[in-house]
A protein has these predicted regions:
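Short acidic/polar active-site loop segments enriched in Thr and Asp
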Residues: 18, 64, 120, 173-178, ...
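Alpha-helical recognition/docking segments in bacterial nutrient-uptake
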Residues: 2-3, 65-168, 172
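Short beta-strand segments enriched in small/hydrophobic residues
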Residues: 21-23, 59-72, 177-184
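Flexible loop/turn connectors
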Residues: 225, 230-327
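Periplasmic-binding protein-like
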Residues: 114, 118-126, 179-182, 210, ...
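N-terminal helix-turn-helix DNA-binding module of bacterial transcription factors
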Residues: 1-64
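Hinge/beta->alpha junction and helix N-cap segments in small-molecule ligand-binding domains
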Residues: 53, 71-80, 98-107, 154-165, ...
């Protein structure tokens, strides 16, 4: 049984008219005869088409509001992304609403329910299951999702290209004992790629070369001493994100470990904060302006009535290695 949501194209096909005519008829616009309008309305009932209120807003000139859902505003990645998304949305005459889910699951659901009632579409780093219920029927774009298991529009992050470039750079620089500090159990996709690339390059992967820590500055500070204790011979470390990596720079300094002379450090995200520390942080960076543009384009595709709000659309965001002083 086909359970996908009907689109404006389905109405046009059944009514035997153009998309434009369906739009004008359903929005009670002029230059559509009463007979045609009735035929379009009847076709909409047949296919169970429910007009998207945001799409109607686009036609009638009402402002569209997009909700950006983040997990923790203390991570500077999210303010940087919010800034880019706000600019891209404003270029289309849209407004943005920010929703910080916080740490408590119950509170996160309440906040998501609240923002869902205020917006026409949602963009966010949402885990599987978070978009059910409150976001049912709301055009949603998942950032850093997997195209294999997400039933919404997705922008998948191409960590593979960036991590390969980072490890190859470290090897070329004479490093061979490369550790990984992750923030997730079970292993994140970043750690799985790290393992695979090491194996492809003929480097031995050891359990002692991996560590899991909180994805905060404090987590990074603590991880610096811990990884040195369990893997004393390491000469490079790939870190889950820039926030942790900056913390590790501080932790290594406290432990009198010289970066990059003793240990090279590579973060992931490409945050501005990486240029404000000493040594400046080498990072696998995502182009947040390009990410914001892709997200806004996907939202527009979901709002125009041609694509169902729960349609599966996928784009890829490429990450690139930005060389600075830490590696």
């Amino acid at each position: 049984m086909d359970t996908r949501a009907s689109t404006i194209n389905d109405v046009a096909r059944v009514a035997g008219v153009s998309r434009q005519t369906v739009t004008r008829a359903l929005n009670d616009m002029p230059d559509v005869s009463a007979t045609t309008r009735e035929r379009v309305i009847a076709a909409a009932r047949v296919v169970n088409y429910r007009p998207n209120r945001a799409a109607q807003g686009l036609v009638r000139g009402r402002e569209v509001t997009v909700g950006l859902v983040v997990s923790d505003l203390r991570n500077p990645y999210y303010p940087e992304l919010a800034s880019e998304l706000t600019r891209k949305a404003a270029s289309r005459g849209w407004s943005m609403v920010l929703c910080d889910l916080g740490a408590e699951p119950a509170d996160a659901r309440r906040r998501l329910d609240t923002v869902a009632r205020r917006v026409d579409a949602v963009v966010g780093h949402l885990m599987p299951g978070q978009w059910t219920g409150a976001l049912t029927g709301i055009p949603t774009v998942i950032l850093d999702g997997s195209p294999d298991d997400v039933e919404r529009a997705v922008i998948a992050f191409d960590y593979e290209t960036g991590i390969r470039a980072a490890i190859d750079h470290l090897i070329t620089s004479g490093r061979s004992r490369i550790a990984m500090v992750d923030a997730e159990v079970p292993p994140s996709s970043r750690r799985l790629i790290y393992r695979r690339v090491l194996a492809e390059r003929g480097l031995h992967h050891l359990p002692a070369s991996e560590l899991v820590a909180p994805d905060t500055h404090e987590g990074g500070i603590g991880a610096a001493a811990r990884i040195r204790a369990q893997y004393p011979r390491l000469d490079a470390v790939l870190v889950f994100n820039d926030v942790m990596a900056v913390g590790m720079l501080k932790g290594f300094t406290r432990g009198h470990v010289r970066v990059p002379r003793d240990v090279a450090v590579v973060g992931i995200d490409g945050l501005d904060i990486g240029t404000l520390v000493t040594p400046e942080l080498t990072s696998i960076a995502i182009d947040k302006a390009a990410l914001a543009e892709a997200a806004v384009e996907l939202v527009a595709a979901l709002l125009d009535g041609v694509t169902a709000p729960d349609a599966r659309l996928c784009r890829s965001a490429r990450l690139t290695l930005v060389l600075r002083e830490s590696a």
